[in-house]
Amino acid sequence: KLRAEDGRSVKNVDISLFIKNLPDRRDTKRFCTEDASGSTSQAAGVVEAMESGAKIFLVDEDTSATNFMIRDELMQMVVHRDQEPITPFVERVRALYDEQGISTILVAGSSGAYFHVADRVIQMDCYVPKEVTKEAKEAAAGFGEGVQALKLTPVSFDRVPKKFKTGGRDERFKMKVLGRDSLQFDRDVVELRFVEQIADTEQIAALGYLLKYAGTHFI
């Protein structure tokens, strides 16, 4: 499940598939920040999911960065593509499936921009799903050619994780569960408040022990 995570840390992630030419000239091929915006955090989340081998993305419009998801025709007329650093997800979603086999399920209620590129459109009518693909495609056809579906550009996955420093003794490396919101490794805190799939602290503890084992045995 992907969402915007304002304020999250991003370490050496290639987000150039979606974001380039930032005003401060930061390198988006190896993007780093301790305080990501909604768009940069969601771009990083997509690339990290690709790197992990995910084959389906679950996206909710309500928890996404609008400027990452869409860019309408009027905005493109005022702010030219060459002046905008963000390539919206709607222009990459088709290629993610065609070239990488990654499907996307998007819940949306305010924009029909994805009707042009969707394989299926399902309407929820009083909690009952209805197939409305034909109607959505016909309606979208009346709004011109729709979005510009772009091919994917190469993404780098050559990050090298930093080895856990245990001083040769595994017991010296401390892992602590901080409620359902975070996990602490020595002095480093892993923020988990936006990972909605986590239901209890036992899951966080299991994740912590898995990371600790991987960090001390495989990295």
Tell what function each PLM region has.
Residues D98-G101, V107-I219:
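Conserved NTP phosphate-binding and transfer environment spanning the P-loop NTPase/kinase superfamily
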Residues G45-E48, R92-A95, A206-L210:
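Alpha-helical scaffold segments in soluble metabolic enzymes
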Residues A49-V93, Y97-E99, S110-K137:
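Conserved P-loop NTPase nucleotide-binding/switch module
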Residues I15-I19, L58-I70, M175-S182:
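A glycine-rich, aromatic-flanked flexible loop/lid motif
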Residues S37-M50:
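Conserved alpha-helical scaffold flanking the Walker A/P-loop in AAA+ ATPase domains
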Residues C32-S39, V79-I86, Q100, T104-A108, ...:
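Hydrophobic alpha-helical scaffolding
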Residues K1-D35, I70:
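P-loop NTPase switch/communication element
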Residues K1, C32-D35, K55, Q100-T104, ...:
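Structural beta-strand/beta-sheet cores of well-ordered domains, especially the beta-sheet scaffolds
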